[in-house]
């Protein structure tokens, strides 16, 4: 059986290091960052193993919400739609980008005892902001197909 927590930790660490933006797991990350990601562990599908194999595959879905908030130094400011679109592009590159020459993933996902078999964009609802709100956000959901290594 594949434990979900190590996968979540690995995805958050990868997105943080590759984007140079803080990532909060289900809540705003510590600190006072104006631009950050929220990572949510959503639904998952479990595929039954063949008769000779006791290990199940797992296909979890993770939601990445790119957030751009108001500038604390500027009263009445708001988040920047261009910033969240850049962040969404970066998240897409981190999880789905491939090297054009080799076809290998640009950013490997390393989880002990787990092999990543596939990655895909599950759904991308896009911007979820209210013009009257100072916070701008953009939502994407990624599916990862995992098998025990």
Regions found by a protein language model. Give the residues of each.
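Intrinsically disordered, low-complexity coil segments
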Residues: 29, 69-83, 124-132
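Intrinsically disordered, low-complexity acidic/polar segments
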Residues: 48, 73-75, 149
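Mid-chain, well-packed structural core segment of small domains
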Residues: 76-103
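Small/polar-rich, solvent-exposed N-terminal microdomains that initiate assembly or binding
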Residues: 1-54, 98-110
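Oligomerization/assembly interface segments of phage tail-like spikes and tubes
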Residues: 56-74, 91, 134-146
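Residues at secondary-structure transition points
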Residues: 2, 51-55, 78, 82, ...
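Acidic-leaning, charged glycine-interspersed low-complexity segments
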Residues: 95-147
């Amino acid at each position: 059986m594949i434990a979900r927590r190590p996968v979540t930790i690995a995805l958050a660490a990868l997105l943080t290091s590759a984007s140079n933006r803080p990532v909060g797991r289900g809540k705003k990350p510590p600190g006072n960052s104006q631009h950050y990601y929220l990572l949510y562990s959503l639904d998952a599908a479990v595929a039954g193993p063949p008769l000779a194999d006791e290990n199940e595959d797992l296909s979890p879905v993770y939601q990445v919400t790119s957030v751009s908030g108001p500038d604390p130094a500027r009263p009445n400011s708001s988040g920047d739609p261009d910033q969240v679109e850049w962040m969404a592009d970066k998240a897409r590159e981190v999880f789905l980008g491939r090297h054009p020459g080799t076809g290998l993933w640009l950013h490997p996902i390393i989880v002990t005892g787990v092999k990543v078999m596939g990655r895909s964009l599950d759904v991308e609802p896009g911007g979820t902001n209210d013009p009257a709100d100072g916070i701008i956000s953009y939502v994407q959901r990624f599916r990862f197909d995992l098998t025990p290594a």
